[in-house]
Amino acid sequence: MPKLKTKSGAKKRFKITATGLLKAGVAGKRHRLIGHNGKYIRQNRGTKVMSASDTKTIRSYMPYGL
């Protein structure tokens, strides 16, 4: 049986932690931030851990883990 390909978009956007959780950047930080307060901007800086249901879907895009 042939090897499975990893979705290149998922490879660029998600990282798998040592415990198997998925980390991803937070959406909505590129432009039009004037209307948001500082707390919103600060809390959405960096990465967040994905939910369990999203993790199951995204892991199917990365069959070998990366």
From Swiss-Prot:
Top-level taxon: Bacteria
GO biological process: translation
GO molecular function annotation: structural constituent of ribosome
InterPro entries from the UniProt entry: Ribosomal_bL35, Ribosomal_bL35-like, Ribosomal_bL35_CS, Ribosomal_bL35_sf
Keywords: Ribonucleoprotein, Ribosomal protein
GO cellular component assignments: cytosolic large ribosomal subunit
Entry-linked PANTHER family: 54S RIBOSOMAL PROTEIN BL35M, LARGE RIBOSOMAL SUBUNIT PROTEIN BL35M
Recorded family membership: Belongs to the bacterial ribosomal protein bL35 family.
Protein name: Large ribosomal subunit protein bL35
Species the sequence originates in: Caulobacter sp. (strain K31)
Taxonomy of the source species: Bacteria, Pseudomonadati, Pseudomonadota, Alphaproteobacteria, Caulobacterales
Gene name as annotated: rpmI
